[in-house]
Amino acid sequence: MTAEAAEKSVEEGLSSSGSAGSSGTRFDLDKETELRFEVEAGERVQLELLSGLAEIFGSELNRNKKYTFGPGSKIAVFTWQGCGVALSGKTEVAYVSKDTPMLLYLNTHAALEQMRRQAEKDNERGPRVMVVGPTDVGKSTVCRMLLNYAVRLGRRPTLVELDVGQSSVSVPGTMSALCIERPADVEEGFSVQAPLVFHFGSTTPGTNIKLYNKLTSSLADAFSQRCEVNRRASVGGCIINTCGWVKGSGYQALVHCASAFQVDVVLVLDQERLYNELKRDLPHFVRVVLLPKSGGVVERSKDCRRETRDEKIREYFYGFRGTSFYPHAFDVRFSDVRIYKIGAPSIPDSCLPLGMSQDDTQLKLVPVSPGRDLTHHVLSVSSVDDEAEVGQSRGILESPACGFIVVTAVDTQAQVMTVLSPAPRPLPRHTLLIMDIRFIDLK
């Protein structure tokens, strides 16, 4: 399963606004080419497949159905046999490219499927795959593609989401696992039903690397337990999406993840240095494969990342495009909940109790007194039993989140806070974990 290709930027087609005529601009694609387009800020673009067959990140398009993409969307419509599509609406850029790594990605899928068939035959477990690389090389897209191709063949792979900044499964600041049972919806992505979600509390692993590694191990244990009782999940294996921090402690976190999940395959996108380091440091039986990134991958600004995070939280409360769900606002008494932050502030080693290290403080539960500074913070509702001993850190750290709320107002005199919740009162549990992430509800 080797894949080393130097990308050449051979692009055909002119940039188009996609606004000519009532039916939009038509693009006729030859086989094994893709139409790439980006949607302008504040705009929406409609795509329609007119003839032939095409897919977006491994999800097949239906003919004569109009798909709508919101502001900032970056889409690639690929065809294996050739097709005709129409675009209507304002695009920032729209062009057809012959130069795509899709054949390499398909070959990767074929090799993984061969491993699944062998696992079925030998009554072994299927491939556990980790996708790594720096930021903005298309890791999430490759994961989505490989999962879609697997599930289209009737497999039941698991997506493990370790990107705490740009999670595709839950709100930012979480680490999660999701069993994939059907291909991703072209517009909405994967159906997120009954994911396993752990609270991390920040958008960067570096804020608490010990907690990050601990939760990685917790997800690996949970996945292994599921594989023991579910043969289809075991054969389907997992695809692990990682974050783009690949140096120092970030690199060590990748090595830890490979060990915790006992990965068989590591796909390295667009960085030879990382490829060679992993080849050197991982066990010899782990296949490390270097793959090129797509020429359509776009670098995202900090503002773009923040907007994406806000949209993900908004989607959690209001549904896709803010139309499907109706969240509830209600008051919660301070006395009814226990609020904690994971990780105590760093203090000089000389001030620590005898025998205690800085690492120990990273997993410490610090009680938070409700006050006005809690306003707009996202809180995880821990699934830990309310009868658990107050401050029992291990139970709270290792318990998944059963949901999330946002504090919209705090009344210190009345000793209550108003929260936005996806479900009506009362809260299912009363142990809350505070995130560094804020969300201002403008609805």
UniProtKB/Swiss-Prot annotation:
Record's catalysed reaction(s): a 5'-end dephospho-2'-deoxyribonucleoside-DNA + ATP = a 5'-end 5'-phospho-2'-deoxyribonucleoside-DNA + ADP + H(+); a 5'-end dephospho-ribonucleoside-RNA + ATP = a 5'-end 5'-phospho-ribonucleoside-RNA + ADP + H(+)
Top-rank taxon: Eukaryota
Keyword Ribosomal protein among UniProt keywords: no
Alphabetized InterPro entries for the sequence: Clp1, Clp1/Grc3, Clp1_C, Clp1_C_sf, Clp1_N, Clp1_N_sf, CLP1_P, P-loop_NTPase
Record region (Disordered): 1-27
Matches recorded under SUPFAM superfamilies: P-loop containing nucleoside triphosphate hydrolases (SSF52540)
Biased composition (Basic and acidic residues): 1-11
Biased composition, class Low complexity, residue ranges: 13-24
Protein family (similarity comment): Belongs to the Clp1 family. Clp1 subfamily.
Assembly notes: Component of the tRNA splicing endonuclease complex. Component of pre-mRNA cleavage complex II (CF-II).
Protein name: Polyribonucleotide 5'-hydroxyl-kinase Clp1
Provenance organism: Danio rerio
